[in-house]
């Protein structure tokens, strides 16, 4: 191996799946969120020293052993479908691209489980199951790109979660490589105090271990499916109907809502929304009787909440486009926003608060979301920005903090932490939960090798007291300057 390489043993292990090319490394400096380079440089060293692309669990373990011996920071990454820098390096180091850990899906019909490798995309996983008469229980709204391992390390709520629960509850067993390179079996649950459980990966964002295999509960492919698209006079009616249907039996497989602001944003991006009023998309699946009972519930909700059922063709189109929410970025150049976990009962209040903020700031803000658990929803509010203009971008960035303030007032919190949401740790979880998470991190990664700088504490620039003051000043400056910037 050439002497000039920083890590010759890794090059020998991986061959052309290891690179120190500046060009190739540069692609890993960002995720879905676009940040001006000068601002990114103030947060951390986002350019990895090298990129490793393992294909097997043994290669992952060997890489981690090497990194542990040298206290080399390792940032795990696959599709990087968030905008919080969960998978962006902060300390240079080694970027571990796990998208190559794919292979056949193994089905255990007796246990009704499937074993899958972490680089497998959720849409591919579900297609592999359906070819044999099975289906996943739930999947993320980014399923065409998001990987199994990535979602298991997030909070894990999405399409199907309302009916079947979060993905952590579907885990039977994991195989994972610890920070010291040890491959270990991780059961779905453990009675042993301090033991690592598969459910403990929820929200860990790649900071505890690297998942190398997962066994998940699956289901028989549904015999019937029914889609409904409803429109309502206001968000109070739309979210009221959503909460009513989510609490009724049978439980919908999918319950997605969008404020009229989202429809307006879609039009700006060149698309034609199904309606310009608040929308609610409901899907039932299962046996034909269950779907028929769901249809009956929808009819009652439409009558009770003064709604209107749109055509079956529009309902089918809405279902087919369920992964395309971010197409509104075409109104661009880009978008910023906030994703919150909110009580379903407060969705209308939240939407009203966001509408008032948009009017105050003179900026369109699109709001949409999904009811993902009994009484709870994930909600996204997005607004346009231009990262090529640093000052307007910085002023616009303050609105994300304002959106979270609206969520906090209505019992919400950020959904996901990464780097950009670390200023809100005190609102995102209790002091006891944060202390427990930090203790778990110290136990399983005492050298802080895996994904350093994420989840547990903010970087200096995002320290909460100064961050809050800075964002308030920027928001005020933006409000004053909106006519000329």
For each of these PLM feature ranges, what is it?
Residues 1-65, 81-112, 262-270, 313-335, ...:
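N-terminal flexible segment immediately upstream of the FAD-binding catalytic core
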Residues 20-38, 220, 226, 231, ...:
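C-terminal substrate-recognition/cap domain of FAD-linked oxidoreductases
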Residues 24-34, 52-55, 66-69, 83, ...:
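Feature of Fe-S/electron-transfer and energy-metabolism proteins
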Residues 103-110, 114-256, 467-468, 478-485:
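FAD-binding subdomain of flavoenzyme oxidoreductases
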Residues 420-485:
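Activity-critical C-terminal alpha-helical subdomain
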